[in-house]
Regions:
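Short amphipathic alpha-helix segments
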Residues: 57-65
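Conserved C-terminal "lid"/linker of ANL adenylate-forming enzymes
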Residues: 72-74, 81, 120-198
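Conserved C-terminal helical docking segment of ANL/AMP-forming enzymes
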Residues: 53, 66-72, 93-142
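Conserved ATP-binding/catalytic segment of the ANL
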Residues: 1-48
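C-terminal boundary motif of the adenylate-forming
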Residues: 27, 32, 67-91, 125-129
């Protein structure tokens, strides 16, 4: 037996224990060597405009693994016409940005950040890995990273998506409004100017 149940919480126990099995909510598959690979959480699934559900973690990991500047990424789609992303830069990556572009205007920096953001799509480890519909069309830079202090990370350093949404849901909504590309670019330019002191 994995566990008897949650202490004094029959409702939560009933949701996860069925016929002596614990349903964790993790999504995964067995690889060719028979190892279980966990790829995400059922609760975190996004919904493409065609109704297809997909896990955001693989794309988020691909972006952070290939990006020179972005340390955290949360992608979003709930049957919207396209996927969007929120990105953060830790202190080291902000310093890297300042060092790389200390004499360059914010517009040029944003062009370079856009190229950097989309690097994963052509990277050999990820090329052709994700359907185009799942890949973020727009990204918005956030003024602070996700941390335990702002409750956007939990104690195991995992992103708390609903807390990010509580804080930045309005920003996400503007990424779907008319002139979303221009509005998101203006938002990003303001943050870039603050980071680079231009």
């Amino acid at each position: 037996n994995v566990m008897a149940g949650y202490f004094k919480n029959r409702e939560a126990t009933a949701k996860v224990l069925h016929d002596g099995r614990l349903f964790t909510g993790d999504l995964g598959y067995y690889d060719e060597d028979g190892f279980l690979v966990v790829v995400g959480r059922k609760k975190a699934l996004l919904i493409a405009p065609n109704g297809e559900k997909y896990s955001p973690e693989g794309i988020e990991e691909a972006i952070t693994n290939t990006s020179r500047y972005f340390s955290q990424v949360m992608i979003y789609n709930d049957m919207k016409p396209y996927t969007v992303a929120l990105v953060t830069m830790d202190v080291l990556r902000q310093q890297r940005l300042r060092n790389d572009y200390h004499q360059v205007d914010a517009e040029h920096i944003l062009e370079q950040l856009s190229k950097d953001f989309h690097t994963y799509a052509d990277h050999p480890n990820y090329q052709g890995h994700f359907p185009k519909l799942w890949m973020p069309k727009l990204f918005a830079i956030l003024p602070e990273p996700f941390t335990e202090q702002n409750f956007m990370l939990n104690s195991t350093m995992k992103m708390v998506r609903h807390k990010v949404m509580d804080n930045y849901g309005q920003l996400i909504e503007t990424m779907y409004e008319p002139n979303a590309e221009q509005r998101t670019a203006l938002h990003n330019l303001n943050l870039i100017r603050g980071i680079t002191h231009h």
